[in-house]
């Protein structure tokens, strides 16, 4: 099963889904961030990851919502207010939400790569909703990228093909046809409509990207803002770019991206440098090598002619005697 599934036991509880797939070789970033915007009401959310046979290693990201990170995550101005010591965020269309921490001790199910979140209605001291929505954001640190990224080996044996490779990102959400029959029927029968499903693919700036969907946007990830969010510490961060696709008013989504990337390693460079040096030496000595080869062939030809003449004379002499 190479599709993620996100469902709720209360219809209409989930408003938006956010998926950020980080795939940067230069920065050694390979994981998935998930954001769920749901109603501030009692419900149970279930997230099922593509089968990998391991328990999800989840990191809560609510503590990262400081400084300019909220603006960077939503790529828009975010207004933050405090109500009864609870931070309330306001984004587009006056949508207000509170940030809810992810409790991995009670939310992760060891079997089937499943994550469960029990949402409880949060009221203020006057029994009034603090905000209409709640937002969960967490990271799957050990997400198996091979479930959504297909490496394509080139059949070309050309010299240029040794420097680059191709991969296809096939990211699917609630794709019923990839599920077992019983599970797919459950998904279809409880199908809900999400206002928006966002998918962002973060990768190195030197990768050449092709997208099947023309309705996408690109964005250069701001320097210095993301370091703490990505847990980079004092490591130098190489530039990255984000490709943003989205599906509106749908229960499922299929995002397809094809990219070509540089796969040259130090071993490749040393081998190629050696080949270039050998070719340069051969090219530099080619005239002398050609003269030597011509002289060798000429001497062999003369020797062959002498040998033939000798055999011919010997044959005639034997015939006369």
Region locations from a protein language model:
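Beta-strand elements of well-folded, non-transmembrane domains
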Residues: 38-40, 51-53, 140-144, 203-205, ...
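Surface-exposed, acidic/Ser/Thr-rich flexible loop segments
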Residues: 120-220
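A surface-exposed beta-strand-loop module
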Residues: 91-160, 234-248
């Amino acid at each position: 099963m190479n599709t993620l599934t996100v469902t709720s036991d209360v219809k209409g509880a989930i408003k938006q889904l956010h998926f950020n797939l980080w795939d940067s070789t230069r920065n050694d970033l390979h994981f998935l961030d998930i954001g769920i915007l749901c109603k501030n009401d009692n419900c149970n959310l279930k997230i099922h990851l593509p089968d990998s046979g391991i328990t999800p290693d989840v990191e809560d990201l609510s503590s990262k919502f400081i400084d300019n990170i909220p603006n960077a995550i939503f790529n828009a101005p975010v207004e933050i207010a405090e109500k009864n010591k609870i931070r309330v965020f306001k984004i587009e269309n006056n949508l207000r939400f509170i940030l809810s921490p992810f409790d991995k001790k009670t939310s992760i199910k060891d079997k089937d790569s499943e994550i469960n979140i029990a949402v409880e209605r949060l009221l203020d001291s006057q029994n009034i909703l603090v905000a209409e929505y709640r937002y969960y954001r967490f990271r799957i640190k050990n997400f198996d990228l091979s479930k959504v990224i297909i490496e394509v080996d080139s059949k070309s044996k050309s010299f240029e093909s040794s420097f680059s490779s191709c991969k296809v990102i096939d990211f699917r959400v609630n794709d019923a046809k990839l599920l077992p029959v019983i599970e797919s029927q459950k998904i279809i029968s409880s199908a809900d409509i999400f206002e928006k499903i966002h998918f962002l693919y973060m990768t190195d700036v030197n990768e050449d990207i092709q997208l099947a969907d023309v309705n996408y946007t690109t964005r250069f990830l701001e320097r210095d803002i993301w370091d703490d969010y990505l847990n980079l510490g004092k490591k130098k961060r190489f530039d990255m770019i984000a490709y943003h696709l989205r599906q509106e008013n749908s229960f499922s989504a299929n995002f397809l991206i094809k990219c070509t990337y540089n796969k040259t390693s130090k071993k490749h460079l040393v081998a190629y440098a050696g080949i270039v040096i050998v070719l340069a030496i051969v090219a530099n000595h080619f005239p002398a090598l050609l003269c030597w080869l011509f002289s060798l062939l000429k001497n062999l030809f003369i020797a062959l002619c002498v040998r033939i003449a000798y055999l011919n004379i010997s044959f005639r002499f034997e015939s006369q005697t």
